[in-house]
From Swiss-Prot:
Disulfide bonds join C14-C47, C24-C37. A motif (Cx9C motif 2) lies at residues 37-47. A motif (Cx9C motif 1) lies at residues 14-24. Residues 11-55 form the CHCH domain. It comes from the Eukaryota. GO terms for cellular component: mitochondrion. PANTHER family: COX ASSEMBLY MITOCHONDRIAL PROTEIN, COX ASSEMBLY MITOCHONDRIAL PROTEIN 2 HOMOLOG. Its main location: mitochondrion. Residues 52-79 are annotated as: Disordered. This is COX assembly mitochondrial protein 2 homolog.
């Protein structure tokens, strides 16, 4: 299962992949069940995974920054 595919939640690169997959599904109503759109799906999932990893790294960096600020504030309060 993948996340919400709303365009405002993803990068332009992923939106292109999402739109290609949706177009393939609409043009191939029955062949999509036999793997006609699998390449588009793989491309989309690869892009979504990259977005997820980028968000996760950014969140971790922000968390480390906030933790460091908290530790520095405690040290200054002790002095």
């Amino acid at each position: 299962m993948h996340p919400d595919l709303s365009s405002h939640l993803h990068t332009d690169e992923c939106n292109v992949a999402i739109n290609l997959l949706k177009k393939c599904h609409s043009e191939n109503q029955f062949l999509k069940y036999f793997g006609q759109c699998n390449d588009f799906d793989r491309e989309m999932r690869k892009c979504l995974k990259k977005e997820y990893e980028d968000r996760r790294a950014k969140s971790r960096a922000r968390s480390e920054h906030m933790k460091q600020r908290l530790l520095n504030a405690e040290k200054q309060a002790d002095n």
